[in-house]
């Protein structure tokens, strides 16, 4: 029993943090204990919960009504079988079976199963009607293959003529067997190195050729505008959307920047509402967050978003307890629970923003193309201010359309899916695109990391088309703010693409998607191939300089075989390679010249921006090469991959971090320079772009991450993009809401969920008590609460925090004990956090009038 004299002070503090009328606050202040206070707050409605020994849980509804009166009008409250109040933060569950097909990646195993009479999984029965675009696509890809092989053959022939040692045909293997090992090495080593150089050159040149022809055809598509197979042309854009064509817009998040995420989502919701089609769309925030502070911030942000947009019953939130299969598992879980309620699903990333017109257009395109399973938009990058991010924004905005249109030209309805800003036909996705873990052990087994390419391949295997709507406006994303954050993202993409290659020979995959798996691997494998090419070139230089040339390769050879050097061929081949690499960029800018460069700063500024971006891309390419080489080796060696969310906000790289990450690259660049200078200083002219970039990697990484330089470049109209010149409404709203959200961002979320009367009510109402009362459960709850009381908020571990946050009964009991026992470690820390927050509402809190903005801690500006 509490002593009334010792209870009055904390009780008055508690009431001061509830938005009450003064008369009501005085009446409740007469309570003799916190149990009585909660009973008075709850009234008769809380009797069931209070009977279970949870006085704070009994008043959850009353406290939430005080802070957010709109919840009652929106009928957001529910009561579970135990009489506990909860918020209807998600629709009723209507479960659908989501059963992944086990992978059989080994063709020998499949053959053995066939021989022994055991069946392999059949190919899905449905097939697309043989449309004209399929024949056209096959013909186009055959032509592309011929162009790549022809171009590579000519270049490789030239490369063979450039290399100095031309006497391989005179090497007699029988003679080699009769001479000493040292003589054999001296005679054969130059030719072995040359063969390696030639093989690597052919692979790399073919890879560059593929990109060149893709960009060239994209240029033609965009210049002429005569793409008869453009999927966005299949809808007029004004057709009414059928009432049963319901669409779920899902946003999977994990430990993200909460103010930015919910700002972008709010801008998207408001844009959707402005179209008048809102009743056919629902929004889902699917959280895999395991940081308790961020999880509480997400809960508050969801409530504020619903209140500001009147989105109760349209915007839903769910946080998973069991985070299996990462993002793909999160989507699977949504499909299993609510997928049957929707015909389509739009997947957004945490940094995505989409206009309502774009979303409605995607649904209309799906309705107009019943054979389409996925339609992918081409998101435009925007919203970043660092110099590095602005250069990347400019590059993707200027050059990206060529490559995206080119991909569409070659692939048509057998195209890419990038995992976000795309619409998916729900039923075939549920039936065919669930991902089983890859069999076996090691780093290339287990849950699939890069799920998007695989889901597109499975959708096409099941007979549905996968399209890119490359000319659809209103789809946006953000890029990493600096080089190191981009490389963190690249590491997990690298591992995921290497894993996906295990599916190359899976039964039923379309050849185009087998090629997609191959290009995904080459996106990263090209880095170590390029590195080894440079190493072999240096080794050949060393052999040429340090070993005595072998002019006579057979006993009765009449004329010597002189090492050859053809600088004119070398220059021609070098020029050709540069043309393939940089002509797409020039064509992109020429297209802008033709269509109007005003949005890019004008003709002069866009041209200067292109030249500066080309210089920086040359400067950063060797740095990326070494990092990607490391990533590939790490994947093959089984080093772990951390799936941390990339930095979404502008962030500068500190010098200490740059030295730690780039220090070895700088030392390698210096050592490589000294070695080549010692061997043959003239060769440094060819190698200087490589070693120079490595030596300068530290200052380039730091300087390019600076916001000040990025803003200055924008003031000078450098790296300008149309979204900055004439900012779309959705992006303006995102910036505005991000600023507002940061102004009153919630900090110390778990501490406030445990102590603050309003946030505790919200956290308890959004949690789910999954089990009935049982002694074992009560024992575990008691241990967790006791541990929290003993350790205090500073020392309590993250796992226990998360467990308490996920259990509303335990969280409400912790709340009760903290206040009843006047725990200074909890209350003192909470009061200090309130005092340190310049945007905290002044106490005592004023009563909230229905229709006002509502009131939650740190929600006042």
UniProtKB/Swiss-Prot annotation:
SUPFAM superfamilies: Nucleotide-diphospho-sugar transferases
Gene name as annotated: opgH
Pfam family, one: Glycos_transf_2
Localization of this protein: Cell inner membrane
Keyword Glycosyltransferase carried by entry: yes
Cross-referenced InterPro entries: Glucans_biosynth_gluTrFase_H (IPR023725), Glyco_trans_2-like (IPR001173), Glycosyltr_2/OpgH_subfam (IPR050321), Nucleotide-diphossugar_trans (IPR029044)
Entry GO terms, CC: plasma membrane
Protein name: Glucans biosynthesis glucosyltransferase H
Functional description taken from the UniProt entry: Involved in the biosynthesis of osmoregulated periplasmic glucans (OPGs).
Species in which this protein is naturally found: Pseudomonas aeruginosa (strain UCBPP-PA14)
Family named by the database record: Belongs to the glycosyltransferase 2 family. OpgH subfamily.
Main subcellular location of this protein, as a coarse class: membrane
UniProt KW keywords: Cell inner membrane, Cell membrane, Glycosyltransferase, Membrane, Transferase, Transmembrane, Transmembrane helix
Enzyme nomenclature, EC number: 2.4.1.-
Superkingdom as given in the UniProt entry: Bacteria
TM segment ranges: 142-162, 188-208, 516-536, 573-593, 600-620, 683-703
Metabolic or biological pathway: Glycan metabolism; osmoregulated periplasmic glucan (OPG) biosynthesis
GO molecular function: hexosyltransferase activity
One Gene Ontology biological process: glucan biosynthetic process
Membrane topology: Multi-pass membrane protein
CDD domains reported for this sequence: Glucan_BSP_MdoH
